[in-house]
A protein has these predicted regions:
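Short, structured motif recognition centered on aromatic/hydrophobic residues
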Residues: 5, 22, 46, 53-56, ...
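Short glycine/serine/threonine/alanine-rich loop segments
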Residues: 28, 74, 98
């Protein structure tokens, strides 16, 4: 498959602190914030040429981002690749023996359907597949 990097996800403790920091660092404003209740996360997006940076703040102390930060600290959480047909790509990866963290695509931030590939099978990198809705 010819994947395009859609965004890079960065886990942060506090969006209120991190948004101004990244606006200064990147020289561009945050263009969108969104809460995704199904993932217990609040997000903020920045556009850098054709790639997005997504900041992820946990909205629940037991959520996956909170657990990630407790274990590894703030930092890069995942790389997301854009796919045209997420269901077909999930089937292709399952046939190749990859473990997916969800059996069906879920509604994610930024009007996307998403699925994650287990990082134990991708050299420790959490891979997200995403398809525009």
């Amino acid at each position: 498959m010819d994947y395009k990097v859609e965004h890079i996800g960065i886990a942060v403790k506090d969006l209120a602190t991190s948004i101004p920091l990244f606006e200064q660092l990147l020289g561009s404003p945050c263009y969108k914030t969104e809460s995704v209740d199904s993932e217990s996360v609040n997000t903020a997006f920045f556009l850098q040429q054709s790639t997005k940076i997504e900041l992820l703040e946990s909205s629940n102390p037991e959520g996956p981002i909170a657990k990630f930060i407790d274990k590894k600290g703030e930092g890069m959480h995942h790389i997301a690749f854009e796919v045209l047909d997420i269901v077909a790509e999930m089937e292709r990866l399952k046939k190749l023996g990859f473990t997916l963290l969800n059996e069906t695509p879920k509604k994610g931030a930024d009007n996307k359907l998403i699925c994650f590939v287990h990082p134990k099978e991708t050299n420790g990198v959490l891979i997200e597949l995403c398809q525009s809705i």
